[in-house]
Regions:
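Short, amphipathic alpha-helical "recognition" segments used to contact nucleic acids or chromatin
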Residues: 5-23
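Short alpha-helical "recognition helix" segments of helix-turn-helix
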Residues: 27-32
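Major-groove recognition helix of helix-turn-helix-like DNA-binding domains
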Residues: 34-52
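Short Lys/Arg-enriched helix C-cap and helix-to-coil transition segments
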Residues: 47-67
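Core catalytic region of metal-dependent phosphoesterases/phosphodiesterases
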Residues: 55, 83, 88-190
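Mobile, glycine- and charge-enriched loop segments
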Residues: 61-93
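Short acidic low-complexity segments
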Residues: 188-202
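Conserved beta-sheet core of the metallophosphoesterase superfamily
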Residues: 203-297, 307
Length: 310
C-alpha cells in the first residue's frame, strides 16, 4: 500500500511544531489548532517520506528558545499547587512559605509550580542599590532557596516558570561575562530536578509568571488568553471569572510567598499596595478544572478551606 502524499512544506511545519513542543504530539496539536490524530498522521507520513527532517531537527543546537515556550502536562484527576514571588533572602522563610510546604505534604499534588521570582537577585539587578541595604549575595539566595525547596513534597512534575527576578541571574552572566556562560551554568543548572520554562499548560490552564498588569491583571490575562490563566508578578491575590457563551474561565493571580513588608521591597517606600501573601490550589476532575482555591493570611495566619495551616 502506497504512503499518502504530504507536501514538504506541511511536513516541515509539523515537525518544527512537534520539536518546539518537546516532541509532545498533544501539545503540538494544541498549538497548530488541529486534532491530535491529524498531527500524529502527518508525523508518521513525514517519517516515511522525509526522514532527514527528524535527523536535522534533532541535531540542531537549539529549537529557537533559550527555555521551552511551554511545558505541557495532562491531568485527569488531581491537584496542582502554584506559588510565586518568594523573593527569597537568606534566613527569611516566611509563614506563607512554611504553609506552602506543609500543604504540599498534605495534598500531595500531581504538580507543583513555582511561578517565578523565587529568587530576588538583589545584587544582580539592573537597578541601583539603596545605601546600607546590605543585599545578600546570589549564592546565599540560591542556598536559601534549596533549603526551602527541600521541605516541599516531591511530585513527578515540578515546574519552575521563569520570572523577571529569576532572569536576573542568567541576564547578568550573559551581559557581564558571556565567555563564562558554559563554565558558570544557568539558574536551571542549580535546580536540576525542576523543569524550567516560560509557561506551563496544564490541560487548558496556562500558568506563567506575567502577562497583563494593573489592578485587573487577572481578568485581562484570562480575557486575552481565551482560557484560564494563573499569573504572579503583581503580588496580588485574587480570582476573577470570565463568563461568556463558551462558559467560564478564570483569571487567577497567585499573590506572593514572600512578605510584602520585607526590606527587599523598600523601594516601594512603605506605601499602601495590593500585595498579599498567598498561593493557589487548582483541582482537576475527569480532566476538567474545578473553581480555583486560594490560601491567604487571615489575622496573620495562613487559611485554606476555613482552617489554619500553620
Amino acid at each position: 500500500m502506497s504512503t499518502p502524499s504530504l507536501a514538504r512544506e506541511v511536513a516541515e511545519d509539523t515537525v518544527r511544531h512537534w520539536y518546539s513542543a518537546e516532541c509532545n504530539t498533544q501539545a503540538a496539536a494544541r498549538r497548530m489548532r488541529f486534532s491530535r490524530q491529524t498531527v500524529q498522521s502527518r508525523l508518521e507520513r513525514a517519517k516515511q517520506l522525509f526522514p532527514e527532517m527528524f535527523i536535522e531537527a534533532n541535531n540542531s543546537p537549539s529549537h529557537e528558545w533559550t527555555l521551552p515556550q511551554f511545558h505541557e502536562i495532562e491531568i485527569d484527576n488531581g491537584t496542582v499547587l502554584i506559588g510565586s514571588d518568594a523573593h527569597i533572602w537568606p534566613h527569611n522563610e516566611t509563614i506563607m512559605m512554611k504553609a506552602f510546604a506543609r500543604l504540599s505534604k498534605e495534598l500531595k499534588p500531581r504538580v507543583i509550580v513555582l511561578n517565578g521570582d523565587i529568587l530576588d537577585g538583589a545584587r544582580v539587578s539592573r537597578h541601583g542599590s539603596l545605601l546600607g541595604q546590605n543585599a545578600p549575595k546570589l549564592t546565599a539566595e540560591i542556598n536559601a532557596a534549596h533549603q526551602w525547596i527541600d521541605t516541599l513534597y516531591k511530585p513527578a512534575e515540578r515546574v519552575w516558570t521563569m520570572g523577571n527576578h529569576d532572569q536576573r541571574v542568567d541576564n547578568y552572566l550573559a551581559n557581564n561575562a558571556p565567555e563564562l556562560d558554559d563554565y558558570a551554568g544557568r539558574l536551571s543548572d542549580r535546580f536540576p530536578q525542576w523543569k524550567f520554562c516560560w509557561a506551563t499548560m496544564i490541560n487548558n490552564l496556562e500558568v506563567r509568571h506575567r502577562f497583563r498588569s494593573g489592578i485587573h491583571a487577572g481578568w485581562n490575562s484570562a480575557l486575552h488568553s481565551g482560557i484560564s490563566t494563573v499569573t504572579g508578578h503583581t503580588h496580588q491575590l485574587q480570582v476573577t471569572a470570565v463568563r461568556n457563551r463558551n462558559g467560564t474561565h478564570w483569571g487567577i493571580e497567585c499573590g506572593m510567598l514572600g512578605d510584602p513588608s520585607h526590606k527587599a521591597f523598600e523601594y516601594a517606600e512603605g506605601s499602601t499596595s495590593r500585595a498579599q501573601s498567598g498561593f493557589v490550589v487548582v483541582t482537576f476532575r475527569n480532566g476538567i478544572m474545578m473553581p480555583p482555591e486560594t490560601v491567604e493570611l487571615i489575622d496573620g495566619r495562613p487559611v485554606f478551606r476555613g482552617n489554619w495551616i500553620v
